[in-house]
């Protein structure tokens, strides 16, 4: 099975890495700041509309192209500034797991990730079961 779509949106620049920690009764408590919760909810709302009827099974190849509003950059120019691709992917895979694209993001055995400046911002996603 192959799932392929484009989500027109301003991609979140806050990432999974930005979780916060506080200490309560001598124990660390991790929490998501409001900005991260908002980004996660926005992504969840977009992805829930596109989830498959049945979760992908077995090994999955995930391709994601992140298109950020170009500003003064050229359309299609690679984005070489933060956020890092691995942090973007962690949030994306967590949300894709939560809405039911697969059972566990450990199933993602192959990843292709790119980030660009673009005239039309959004996220291109292609997920496919590998034989």
Question: Which role fits each region the language model picked out?
Answer:
Residues 1-131:
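Acidic, proline/glycine-enriched N-terminal capping motif
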């Amino acid at each position: 099975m192959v799932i392929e779509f484009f989500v027109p949106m301003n991609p979140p620049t806050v990432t999974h890495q930005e979780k916060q920690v506080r200490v309560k009764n001598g124990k660390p408590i991790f929490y998501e700041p409001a900005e991260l919760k908002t980004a996660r909810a926005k992504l969840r709302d977009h992805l829930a509309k596109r989830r498959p009827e049945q979760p992908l099974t077995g090994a999955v190849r995930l391709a994601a192209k992140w298109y950020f509003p170009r500003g003064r950059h050229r359309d299609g120019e690679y984005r070489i500034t933060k956020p890092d691709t691995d942090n973007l992917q962690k949030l994306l895979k967590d949300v894709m797991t939560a809405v039911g694209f697969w059972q566990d993001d450990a199933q993602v055995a192959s990843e292709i990730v790119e980030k660009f400046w673009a005239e039309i911002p959004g996220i291109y996603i292609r997920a496919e079961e590998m034989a």
